[in-house]
Swiss-Prot record:
Its EC number is 6.1.1.12. One of its GO terms (cellular component) is cytoplasm. The keyword ATP-binding applies. InterPro entries: Aa-tRNA-synt_II, aa-tRNA-synth_II, aa-tRNA-synth_II/BPL/LPL, Asp-tRNA-ligase_1, Asp-tRNA-ligase_1_N, Asp/Asn-tRNA-synth_IIb, AspRS_core, GAD-like_sf. Belongs to the class-II aminoacyl-tRNA synthetase family. Type 1 subfamily. It comes from Leuconostoc mesenteroides subsp. mesenteroides (strain ATCC 8293 / DSM 20343 / BCRC 11652 / CCM 1803 / JCM 6124 / NCDO 523 / NBRC 100496 / NCIMB 8023 / NCTC 12954 / NRRL B-1118 / 37Y). The keyword Membrane does not apply. This is Aspartate--tRNA ligase. PROSITE patterns: AA_TRNA_LIGASE_II.
Amino acid sequence: MKRTNYAGLIDETYLNQTVTLTGWVQKRRDFGDLIFVDLRDREGIVQLTFNATNADALAVAEKVRSEYVLKITGHVIERAENQINTKIKSGTIEVDVTEAEILSTSKTPPFYIEDDVNANEELKLQYRYLDLRRPEMQKNLRIRSKIMSSAMHFMDTHDFINIETPVLAKSTPEGARDYLVPSRVFPGSFYALPQSPQLFKQLLMGAGFDRYFQIARAFRDEDLRGDRQPEFTQMDVETSFMTADEIRELVNAWVKAMMHDVVDFDLDTAEIPTLTWQESMDRFGTDKPDLRIAYEIKDLSETVKNSEFGVFANAIKGGGVVKALAVPGGADHYSRKDIDKLTKYIERFGAKGLAWMKVAPEGLTGPIAKFFDDEAQAALIASADAQVGDLLLFGAGRADVVSATLDYLRRETAKALDLIDQTNPWAFAWIVDWPLFEYSEDFDRWIAAHHPFTMPNEEDLHYLNDGEDPHKAHAQSYDLVLNGYELGSGSIRIHRMDIQEKMLKALGFTPEKAHEAFGFLLEGMEYGFPPMGGIALGLDRLAMLLAGQENIREVIAFPKNSRATEPMTEAPTRVEGKQLNELGLFVPEAE
């Protein structure tokens, strides 16, 4: 059954040669004694011709239908002038078939195997093996493969050691909900699928491996969205005896190599900006800004603190802020009805309304313009860095609500007005100097902004002492952002037990609880751990961006849907009572 070539790679260089090809039937066009078949494989499509000169092959062609698997042998010839297709690599040639064999038949597929197919998402996931035949999906998964190959090559040439860490691990209270795996041998006890290899890679540094790398699977039982899945893949790195700056330089070189290998883009890492977390929040309202959007959020709190507009004045008096976004050209684009839609949407961020004005040649117009005299209007326009024709959108109130609201409005308006700079397709940025802690509304307490093993800035270590306010501390942590997505997160780790114990105490752990959860790590630190740091880059998210997709499902072979189920295999499913009994588990019958 040996084939000589991939069908999609046949071009003019193969003219007058005999080839043997295999693949799937994309289309069949029957003209009696002349039949055309488009044969598809992973590389693309080539046109086959069957005619009465080769009667046996023609008889086979009369039987084939879409998605039949075919093997043919034939001669590569030039297409007739009216048959040339400039959209495909093989568009100037075709294969005159002399031998043909049907290797497999196919039922009529539930949707067309072609890009831009108009099919229900659940249906495509149910028949994922058919969806994966589409050229776009083939391209996406090959981009993913290239990223992994490039990463492994880079790490190998930079003396990193590829080490696997356990998938059945201990449940530790360090982040999202764990996926638990019951133990048959120890009834009532559970393993947890790892949310990251974090603790194991720190222990590997303690073991002296110095440079660790792994393409690791990780699992988090959390609510899903377009750029998250319950199981995901990260390119995980840990190093000893390197500073945060040195680690970022290493990652810059790594990302530069990947961009060249995968999308043939020459990334100038010297132009990757570094922003503090606070600067990013002030300018963009988010810790993962899309720097392809030129306009930024402006703080107008000082400008409007004595305003006659009660919403602004009361926000300032209540300890809040007033900020604005000047949307270029937005005045003509957005009607009152359009703005009402934006107002309704931002309620999910806690915003109670959306104040707005338009910048006209004669000054500001809109429902709240009457509260500002000419001098106040001029001050507003200047403070917001606005121009005639701009739409001014305001956020007033609690700082976090204002940030979330204006971040969304910045991204949404840029998309609607086509204001995303396409000349800068890959806008990377480093976000540094993060708060060590953040307040969680879900848990109603302070939690680690990254994880409990992040080293505070040297000058902030005293905040972990008794009597100090630990929430003032900042961390030696850093995130790599690309086009408004968090691509990777890393930090310098705590390598001293005294600091780690203080950190856990600040998070509410008693000494007993700390040793119950992390005793193995704390004990390891008593045996001489080196200074260490690392990062993990999300493979799924990077592949999504490099493939030009908007959902990571498009770059994962067999993903879950938004309900964390897998329509093709119908996972998760209930299991037999015998299996539950062996595990010492009781599950009530479903109603």
